[in-house]
Regions:
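N-terminal Rossmann-like dinucleotide-binding module
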Residues: 1, 9, 79, 90, ...
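N-terminal glycine-/serine-/threonine-rich beta1-alpha1-beta2 phosphate-ribose binding loop
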Residues: 1-44, 53-72
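Active-site-proximal beta-strand/loop segments in catalytic clefts of secreted hydrolases
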Residues: 6-7, 22-23, 47-48, 73-76, ...
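Short loop/turn motifs at secondary-structure junctions
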Residues: 15, 94-97, 180
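Residues embedded in well-ordered beta-strands within globular domains across many folds
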Residues: 20, 99-102, 129, 185
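A structural signal for well-ordered alpha-helical segments within the folded catalytic domains
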Residues: 29, 33, 56, 80-84, ...
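Rossmann-like dinucleotide-binding domain that binds NAD(P)(H)
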Residues: 126-190
Length: 190
């Protein structure tokens, strides 16, 4: 397979009709919108958006390109032994009438201060940051740890909360409904 350091090269290719977006979170919407504009079907990993503005942007793009498939993936939906089993139990009424759901996640890793470092030669730090605010390179700012920096992600809420809120909504048959969470704070979503 061909490898590119710039996603736009993939979007230019006429022989590609579907893209799978598995980038750091802050890139999801920009690439997804540009992929739809390029006529590509899109599969994007969670979290789909980090802000309400991004949500509105992708909604408009999906409405404009309704002839294209647009899917958001979360791996917990395919875990047959845990989450699918729990969803089936709720949907069959085995747990009674569910009145309230609390989704809990533990805190994000903390630490630092993290030292400024030289950018590894194989990393295009400017491209990696993309539309995020320009910052000096620190090893703990990219790769897996990007999730704990709000320039690039939403912390544990978008990293794990997206999974657990999705499972609760799925179990309660709320995924297709216009109703979402009624209250959100730093520790609870009801």
């Amino acid at each position: 397979a061909d490898a590119y350091g710039d996603y736009r090269k993939v979007l230019e290719r006429k022989d590609i009709d579907t893209v799978s977006i598995v980038t750091p979170d802050h890139w999801h919407i920009k690439i997804a919108v540009e992929a739809l504009e390029a006529g590509k079907h899109v599969f994007v990993q969670k979290p789909l958006t980090l802000t309400l503005e991004e949500n509105q942007l992708i909604r408009r793009a999906c409405e404009k390109h309704s002839n294209l498939a647009f899917l958001v993936g979360t791996q917990q939906r395919s875990d047959r032994n845990k989450f699918m089993r729990a969803v089936n139990m709720v949907q069959k009424g085995l747990l009674g009438d569910i009145k309230h759901v609390t989704v809990g996640i533990n805190g994000s890793p903390t630490g630092g201060p993290f030292p400024i470092a030289d950018v590894p030669k194989e990393l295009d730090w400017e491209m990696w940051q993309g539309q995020a605010p320009a910052k000096e390179y620190r090893e703990k700012r990219c790769h897996y740890q990007f999730r704990w920096w709000y320039e690039y992600s939403g912390g544990k809420f978008t990293d794990w909360g997206a999974h657990h809120v999705d499972i609760a909504m799925w179990a309660l048959n709320k995924n297709g409904a216009k109703q979402g969470p009624t209250a959100v704070d730093g520790t609870n979503c009801t």
